[in-house]
Amino acid sequence: MSTAADSPLSLAHYYLPVYRPRQVVLERGQGSRVWDDQGREYLDLSSGIAVSGLGHNDPDLMAALTEQAGKLWHTSNVFFSAPPLKLAEELVTASRFAQKVFLCNSGTEANEAAIKLVRKWASSQGRPADKRVIVTFRGSFHGRTLASVTATAQPKYQEGYEPLPGGFRYVDFNDVPALESAMASGDVAAVMLEPIQGEGGVMPAAPGFLARVRALCDQHDALLVLDEIQCGMGRTGSLFAHWQEQVTPDIVTLAKALGGGFPIGAMLAGPKVAETMQFGAHGTTFGGNPLAAAVARVALRKLASPQIAENVARQSAALRAGLEALNAEFGVFAQIRGRGLMLGAVLAPAHAGQAGAILDLAAAHGLLLLQAGPDVLRFVPALNLTDAELADGLARLRLAIAAYVAQH
């Protein structure tokens, strides 16, 4: 246990100050619980921003990691190794649509690869540069690289990075007429969206919206790109969120829970685009390394299991019921939205802008949560969350909300 004098927090000034973490130094985790360097225990309903889909220190992931660590960590992509080859096959099979996979290190990299693939495909079709537009949606979040942050239709993430790359067009999420208008000029090469917007407030696509987007893409010979980096890998109750809408994409991007906490990303390419990128068209030094791929293979197998799907359904219902009960008592929420274990509690107008304050109180009561903007509490726990862990989390949340109401 560290003291204030020797706390790692004294080293925080060496960080580029692009984050605003809470003043807690987490040291270890088990399941949906973590402990800080003072020995204090927290119930984690954030799972590292939807990354630790199997909780902390999952024994099967640990076994895969340690076994592979004793064999081979890295080769680069000028040589083959078995784990990424097997992972690619398993992702193609699991996806029900893909023919090829590009493995990388993060969600941003997966989306960057998808953007490049769209442009390369449009070029291969003989389309001039001004007819390779990618439509994205306001409230989206697709990453932090220059192209992916341009795809992210939120000015707060783009400010100061101008000039941004051209060839992107923004429309309101779930607005079919606006999308029809945006595609009418015939210059759109792809539509890119999250089936559930995460950073944009846990906002699901409206029923039938994805199907309409798919139809418009077919009508205009444009690609459908689905960013499932946060909502994929079992989080909504099915391995891929778009399965519930019965649409077939051309490209899907994955990361976060795919590695169960170990960094990895993937871009899945369907038959229309699978052969577009050939030798030298794209690449990565670390992407698909044997260590990450070995862990991801086990994470994929477990996240695709019926047991996870059943648990997500049960805990989602219990979490919704618990949040509704808290709202009946305190009246702080206007709406509970989302799907599976990706839920957002939207604050009532009287409490607008107070998500951060509630999160601070939650942490003080031993509960780790996220926000999705200033008005939404975001719940993205581990998908193997137990009944007891959820009950404990809701009890701690009640104490936090009671303290918040007492202060306001």
Swiss-Prot record:
Q: Copy the pathway line from the protein's UniProt record.
A: Amino-acid biosynthesis; L-arginine biosynthesis; N(2)-acetyl-L-ornithine from L-glutamate: step 4/4
Name the chemical reaction catalysed here.
N(2)-acetyl-L-ornithine + 2-oxoglutarate = N-acetyl-L-glutamate 5-semialdehyde + L-glutamate
Q: Which residues carry this modification: N6-(pyridoxal phosphate)lysine?
A: K256
Query: Per UniProt, where does pyridoxal 5'-phosphate bind?
Result: G107, T108, F141, D227, E228, I229, Q230, T285
**InterPro entries registered for this protein in UniProt:** AcOrn/SuccOrn_fam, Aminotrans_3, Aminotrans_3_PPA_site, Class-III_PLP-dep_AT, PyrdxlP-dep_Trfase, PyrdxlP-dep_Trfase_major, PyrdxlP-dep_Trfase_small
**In the record, what terms sit under GO molecular function?**
identical protein binding; N2-acetyl-L-ornithine:2-oxoglutarate 5-aminotransferase activity; pyridoxal phosphate binding
Name the keywords, alphabetized: Amino-acid biosynthesis, Aminotransferase, Arginine biosynthesis, Cytoplasm, Pyridoxal phosphate, Transferase
Superkingdom of this protein's organism? Bacteria
Q: Could you tell me where this protein is found in the cell?
A: Cytoplasm
Q: Which SUPFAM superfamilies match?
A: PLP-dependent transferases
GO biological process: what's one of them? L-arginine biosynthetic process
Q: Which cofactor does it need?
A: pyridoxal 5'-phosphate
Entry's family note: Belongs to the class-III pyridoxal-phosphate-dependent aminotransferase family. ArgD subfamily.
Instruction: Check the record and name the PANTHER family matching this protein.
Output: AMINOTRANSFERASE CLASS III (PTHR11986), SUCCINYLORNITHINE TRANSAMINASE (PTHR11986:SF113)
Q: Which HAMAP family match?
A: ArgD_aminotrans_3 (MF_01107)
On assembly, the entry states:
Homodimer.
Share any extra remarks.
May also have succinyldiaminopimelate aminotransferase activity, thus carrying out the corresponding step in lysine biosynthesis.
Q: Under which name does UniProt file this protein?
A: Acetylornithine aminotransferase
Gene that codes for this? argD
